[in-house]
Protein backbone atom coordinates (compact mmCIF):
# COMPACT_ATOMS: atom_id res chain seq x y z
CA UNK A 1 0.00 0.00 0.00
CA UNK A 2 1.36 3.41 -0.96
CA UNK A 3 0.90 5.98 1.79
CA UNK A 4 0.24 9.64 1.06
CA UNK A 5 3.06 11.57 2.72
CA UNK A 6 0.80 14.63 2.91
CA UNK A 7 -2.02 13.12 4.98
CA UNK A 8 -2.32 12.89 8.78
CA UNK A 9 -5.24 11.49 10.77
CA UNK A 10 -6.16 12.76 14.24
CA UNK A 11 -8.61 10.64 16.23
CA UNK A 12 -10.86 12.54 18.66
CA UNK A 13 -13.60 11.26 20.96
CA UNK A 14 -15.07 14.56 22.15
CA UNK A 15 -13.20 14.58 25.46
CA UNK A 16 -10.76 17.20 26.72
CA UNK A 17 -8.24 14.40 27.04
CA UNK A 18 -8.29 13.57 23.33
CA UNK A 19 -8.16 17.28 22.49
CA UNK A 20 -4.75 17.61 24.16
CA UNK A 21 -3.34 16.22 20.90
CA UNK A 22 -4.78 19.04 18.77
CA UNK A 23 -2.06 21.70 18.99
CA UNK A 24 0.81 19.29 18.38
CA UNK A 25 -0.99 17.65 15.46
CA UNK A 26 -1.81 21.02 13.91
CA UNK A 27 1.84 22.07 14.22
CA UNK A 28 2.97 18.78 12.66
CA UNK A 29 0.57 19.25 9.76
CA UNK A 30 1.95 22.74 9.12
CA UNK A 31 5.57 21.57 9.30
CA UNK A 32 4.94 18.64 6.98
CA UNK A 33 2.56 20.58 4.71
CA UNK A 34 0.02 17.82 5.28
CA UNK A 35 -3.74 17.58 4.90
CA UNK A 36 -5.31 16.76 8.26
CA UNK A 37 -8.18 14.28 8.60
CA UNK A 38 -10.17 14.72 11.82
CA UNK A 39 -12.11 11.62 12.84
CA UNK A 40 -14.91 11.51 15.41
CA UNK A 41 -16.53 8.09 15.47
CA UNK A 42 -20.16 7.70 16.56
CA UNK A 43 -21.89 4.47 17.50
CA UNK A 44 -25.21 3.46 15.91
CA UNK A 45 -28.05 4.07 18.37
CA UNK A 46 -30.95 1.65 18.71
CA UNK A 47 -34.52 2.42 19.71
CA UNK A 48 -35.61 0.84 22.99
CA UNK A 49 -38.99 0.04 21.43
CA UNK A 50 -38.41 -0.58 17.72
CA UNK A 51 -41.87 -2.08 17.26
CA UNK A 52 -43.42 1.22 18.36
CA UNK A 53 -40.81 3.62 16.98
CA UNK A 54 -39.17 1.87 14.01
CA UNK A 55 -37.34 4.99 12.83
CA UNK A 56 -36.29 6.35 16.20
CA UNK A 57 -32.93 4.58 16.29
CA UNK A 58 -31.97 6.02 12.91
CA UNK A 59 -33.09 9.48 14.01
CA UNK A 60 -30.92 9.23 17.13
CA UNK A 61 -27.99 8.06 15.02
CA UNK A 62 -28.43 10.93 12.56
CA UNK A 63 -28.52 13.40 15.43
CA UNK A 64 -25.36 11.89 16.90
CA UNK A 65 -23.55 12.20 13.56
CA UNK A 66 -24.73 15.79 13.16
CA UNK A 67 -23.43 16.51 16.65
CA UNK A 68 -20.09 14.91 15.82
CA UNK A 69 -19.73 17.05 12.70
CA UNK A 70 -20.68 20.20 14.63
CA UNK A 71 -18.06 19.25 17.22
CA UNK A 72 -15.31 18.89 14.62
CA UNK A 73 -16.32 22.12 12.90
CA UNK A 74 -16.14 23.93 16.26
CA UNK A 75 -12.46 22.98 16.46
CA UNK A 76 -11.54 24.30 13.02
CA UNK A 77 -10.19 27.56 14.43
CA UNK A 78 -7.39 25.65 16.17
CA UNK A 79 -6.08 24.41 12.82
CA UNK A 80 -5.40 27.74 11.13
CA UNK A 81 -3.43 27.30 7.93
CA UNK A 82 -4.14 23.56 7.72
CA UNK A 83 -6.30 21.89 5.08
CA UNK A 84 -8.98 19.89 6.94
CA UNK A 85 -11.15 16.92 6.06
CA UNK A 86 -13.85 15.91 8.56
CA UNK A 87 -15.00 12.33 9.09
CA UNK A 88 -17.92 11.25 11.32
CA UNK A 89 -18.29 7.55 10.51
CA UNK A 90 -20.41 5.04 12.39
CA UNK A 91 -19.05 1.95 14.06
CA UNK A 92 -16.53 0.61 16.52
CA UNK A 93 -13.86 3.31 17.08
CA UNK A 94 -10.82 1.04 16.81
CA UNK A 95 -12.02 -0.56 13.58
CA UNK A 96 -13.29 2.65 12.01
CA UNK A 97 -10.17 4.69 12.82
CA UNK A 98 -8.05 1.97 11.22
CA UNK A 99 -10.35 1.81 8.21
CA UNK A 100 -10.29 5.57 7.59
CA UNK A 101 -6.50 5.65 7.97
CA UNK A 102 -6.14 2.93 5.34
CA UNK A 103 -8.78 4.32 2.97
CA UNK A 104 -7.12 7.74 3.06
CA UNK A 105 -3.60 6.21 2.96
CA UNK A 106 -2.50 8.49 5.82
CA UNK A 107 1.22 8.58 6.64
CA UNK A 108 0.51 9.17 10.32
CA UNK A 109 -2.24 8.49 12.86
CA UNK A 110 -2.19 10.61 16.03
CA UNK A 111 -3.97 9.71 19.26
CA UNK A 112 -3.79 10.95 22.84
CA UNK A 113 -2.94 8.15 25.25
CA UNK A 114 -2.05 7.90 28.90
CA UNK A 115 1.41 6.66 29.77
CA UNK A 116 2.17 4.93 33.06
CA UNK A 117 -0.83 6.18 35.05
CA UNK A 118 -4.51 6.66 34.61
CA UNK A 119 -6.97 4.89 32.33
CA UNK A 120 -7.67 6.54 28.99
CA UNK A 121 -10.99 6.15 27.26
CA UNK A 122 -8.92 4.67 24.45
CA UNK A 123 -6.96 2.22 26.55
CA UNK A 124 -3.87 0.55 25.17
CA UNK A 125 -5.04 -3.01 24.80
CA UNK A 126 -8.15 -1.86 22.95
CA UNK A 127 -8.31 1.02 20.48
CA UNK A 128 -4.71 2.24 20.42
CA UNK A 129 -3.28 -1.28 20.37
CA UNK A 130 -5.71 -2.36 17.64
CA UNK A 131 -4.74 0.64 15.52
CA UNK A 132 -1.03 -0.07 16.06
CA UNK A 133 -1.51 -3.62 14.84
CA UNK A 134 -3.76 -2.99 11.86
CA UNK A 135 -2.71 0.19 10.06
CA UNK A 136 0.20 0.68 7.72
CA UNK A 137 0.60 4.26 8.91
CA UNK A 138 3.00 5.39 11.58
CA UNK A 139 1.17 5.89 14.89
CA UNK A 140 2.03 8.73 17.29
CA UNK A 141 0.76 8.32 20.86
CA UNK A 142 0.89 11.68 22.62
CA UNK A 143 0.97 12.20 26.38
CA UNK A 144 -0.94 15.18 27.82
CA UNK A 145 1.70 15.50 30.54
CA UNK A 146 4.62 15.54 28.08
CA UNK A 147 3.75 17.43 24.92
CA UNK A 148 6.46 18.46 22.42
CA UNK A 149 7.31 22.04 21.55
CA UNK A 150 4.67 24.36 20.05
CA UNK A 151 6.33 23.76 16.67
CA UNK A 152 5.34 20.10 16.89
CA UNK A 153 8.90 18.83 16.64
CA UNK A 154 11.04 16.74 18.95
CA UNK A 155 14.51 17.55 20.28
CA UNK A 156 15.77 14.29 21.80
CA UNK A 157 14.55 11.03 20.31
CA UNK A 158 15.38 7.56 21.57
CA UNK A 159 15.53 4.90 18.84
CA UNK A 160 15.90 1.34 20.19
CA UNK A 161 17.54 -1.17 17.82
CA UNK A 162 17.74 -4.94 18.14
CA UNK A 163 20.15 -5.73 15.35
CA UNK A 164 17.39 -6.28 12.78
CA UNK A 165 17.05 -4.31 9.56
CA UNK A 166 13.47 -3.43 10.48
CA UNK A 167 14.45 -1.63 13.68
CA UNK A 168 17.18 0.29 11.84
CA UNK A 169 14.65 1.47 9.27
CA UNK A 170 13.15 3.69 11.96
CA UNK A 171 16.25 5.88 11.78
CA UNK A 172 15.51 6.63 8.15
CA UNK A 173 11.88 7.51 8.87
CA UNK A 174 11.98 9.60 12.03
CA UNK A 175 13.90 12.58 10.58
CA UNK A 176 10.90 14.68 9.44
CA UNK A 177 9.53 14.72 12.99
CA UNK A 178 12.71 16.09 14.57
CA UNK A 179 13.87 19.63 15.22
CA UNK A 180 17.00 20.93 13.52
CA UNK A 181 20.02 19.77 15.49
CA UNK A 182 18.01 17.19 17.43
CA UNK A 183 19.79 14.56 19.49
CA UNK A 184 19.27 10.92 18.47
CA UNK A 185 20.10 8.29 21.10
CA UNK A 186 20.37 4.87 19.43
CA UNK A 187 19.94 2.22 22.11
CA UNK A 188 20.76 -1.48 22.03
CA UNK A 189 19.36 -3.18 25.15
CA UNK A 190 21.10 -6.50 25.73
CA UNK A 191 19.96 -9.56 27.66
CA UNK A 192 17.51 -10.79 25.02
CA UNK A 193 19.34 -13.48 23.07
CA UNK A 194 22.52 -15.56 23.21
CA UNK A 195 24.08 -13.02 20.87
CA UNK A 196 23.22 -10.26 23.35
CA UNK A 197 24.88 -12.11 26.24
CA UNK A 198 27.99 -12.54 24.13
CA UNK A 199 27.95 -8.85 23.29
CA UNK A 200 27.49 -7.79 26.90
CA UNK A 201 30.29 -9.96 28.27
CA UNK A 202 32.86 -8.82 25.73
CA UNK A 203 33.82 -5.15 26.21
CA UNK A 204 35.80 -5.13 22.98
CA UNK A 205 32.75 -6.36 21.09
CA UNK A 206 30.62 -3.63 22.68
CA UNK A 207 33.14 -1.02 21.55
CA UNK A 208 33.21 -2.55 18.07
CA UNK A 209 29.41 -2.60 17.89
CA UNK A 210 29.09 1.05 18.94
CA UNK A 211 31.69 2.04 16.34
CA UNK A 212 29.77 0.03 13.73
CA UNK A 213 26.58 1.90 14.61
CA UNK A 214 28.37 5.25 14.36
CA UNK A 215 29.57 4.37 10.88
CA UNK A 216 26.10 3.26 9.82
CA UNK A 217 24.54 6.44 11.16
CA UNK A 218 27.05 8.89 9.78
CA UNK A 219 24.51 10.19 7.25
CA UNK A 220 22.37 11.49 10.13
CA UNK A 221 25.24 13.63 11.40
CA UNK A 222 25.45 15.09 7.91
CA UNK A 223 21.82 16.24 8.30
CA UNK A 224 22.57 18.15 11.49
CA UNK A 225 21.39 15.46 13.91
CA UNK A 226 23.53 14.54 16.89
CA UNK A 227 23.73 10.73 17.02
CA UNK A 228 24.84 8.88 20.17
CA UNK A 229 24.86 5.03 20.09
CA UNK A 230 24.45 3.29 23.46
CA UNK A 231 24.61 -0.35 24.61
CA UNK A 232 23.10 -1.16 28.01
CA UNK A 233 22.20 -4.29 29.95
CA UNK A 234 18.61 -5.10 30.82
CA UNK A 235 15.18 -6.22 29.70
CA UNK A 236 14.29 -4.31 26.55
CA UNK A 237 11.09 -2.45 27.48
CA UNK A 238 12.20 -1.50 31.00
CA UNK A 239 15.60 -0.37 29.73
CA UNK A 240 14.05 1.76 27.00
CA UNK A 241 11.58 3.46 29.35
CA UNK A 242 14.23 4.03 32.04
CA UNK A 243 16.76 5.43 29.57
CA UNK A 244 14.18 7.83 28.12
CA UNK A 245 13.28 9.14 31.57
CA UNK A 246 16.86 9.44 32.82
CA UNK A 247 18.08 11.23 29.71
CA UNK A 248 15.18 13.61 29.10
CA UNK A 249 14.03 12.10 25.81
CA UNK A 250 10.88 13.73 24.44
CA UNK A 251 10.12 10.93 21.95
CA UNK A 252 10.67 7.19 21.61
CA UNK A 253 10.56 5.97 18.00
CA UNK A 254 10.29 2.22 17.35
CA UNK A 255 9.21 -0.32 14.77
CA UNK A 256 6.16 -2.46 15.46
CA UNK A 257 8.09 -5.66 14.86
CA UNK A 258 11.73 -6.63 14.70
CA UNK A 259 13.57 -9.90 14.53
CA UNK A 260 10.63 -12.20 13.82
CA UNK A 261 9.16 -10.34 10.85
CA UNK A 262 5.63 -11.23 11.97
CA UNK A 263 2.88 -8.61 12.20
CA UNK A 264 3.49 -8.25 15.90
CA UNK A 265 5.56 -6.07 18.14
CA UNK A 266 9.34 -5.90 18.08
CA UNK A 267 10.83 -8.80 20.07
CA UNK A 268 7.39 -10.03 21.12
CA UNK A 269 5.70 -7.20 22.98
CA UNK A 270 8.39 -4.58 23.57
CA UNK A 271 6.66 -1.81 21.64
CA UNK A 272 3.40 -2.55 23.42
CA UNK A 273 5.09 -2.42 26.83
CA UNK A 274 6.91 0.80 25.99
CA UNK A 275 3.71 2.37 24.70
CA UNK A 276 2.01 1.48 27.98
CA UNK A 277 4.80 2.59 30.31
CA UNK A 278 6.64 5.51 28.73
CA UNK A 279 5.95 8.98 30.07
CA UNK A 280 6.95 10.63 26.78
CA UNK A 281 5.25 10.29 23.35
CA UNK A 282 5.84 7.09 21.39
CA UNK A 283 6.07 6.98 17.59
CA UNK A 284 5.64 3.49 16.11
CA UNK A 285 6.49 2.66 12.51
CA UNK A 286 5.22 -0.48 10.77
CA UNK A 287 7.92 -1.92 8.57
CA UNK A 288 6.01 -4.32 6.32
CA UNK A 289 2.54 -4.41 4.76
CA UNK A 290 -0.22 -5.80 6.91
CA UNK A 291 -0.69 -9.54 6.40
Give each language-model segment a name.
Residues 1-4, 17, 24, 46, ...:
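Structural beta-alpha unit
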Residues 26, 73, 129, 155, ...:
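Active-site phosphate/pyrophosphate- and oxyanion-stabilizing loops and adjacent acidic/basic residues
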Residues 9-10, 36-38, 71, 108-112, ...:
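Short, structured motif recognition centered on aromatic/hydrophobic residues
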Residues 4, 31, 95-147, 242-291:
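Gly/Ser-rich helix-loop-strand patches that form or flank binding pockets
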Residues 56-70, 203-211:
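A short acidic, glycine-rich active-site loop
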Residues 21, 68-71, 127, 166, ...:
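Hydrophobic alpha-helical membrane-association signature
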Residues 2-55, 153-203, 214-228, 287-290:
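Small/aliphatic-rich secondary-structure junction motif
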Residues 54-57, 103, 127-128, 157-159, ...:
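Short, hinge-like loop/turn segments at secondary-structure boundaries
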Amino acid sequence: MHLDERKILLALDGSEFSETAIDTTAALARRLDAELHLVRVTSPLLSTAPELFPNLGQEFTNQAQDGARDYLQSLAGRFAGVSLQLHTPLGNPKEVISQVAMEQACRLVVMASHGRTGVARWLLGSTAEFVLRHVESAVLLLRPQAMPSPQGDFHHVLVPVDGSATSREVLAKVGPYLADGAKVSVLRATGLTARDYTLLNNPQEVTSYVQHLKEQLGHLDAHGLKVEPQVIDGEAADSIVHFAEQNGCDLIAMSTHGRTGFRRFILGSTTEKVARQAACPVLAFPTHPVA
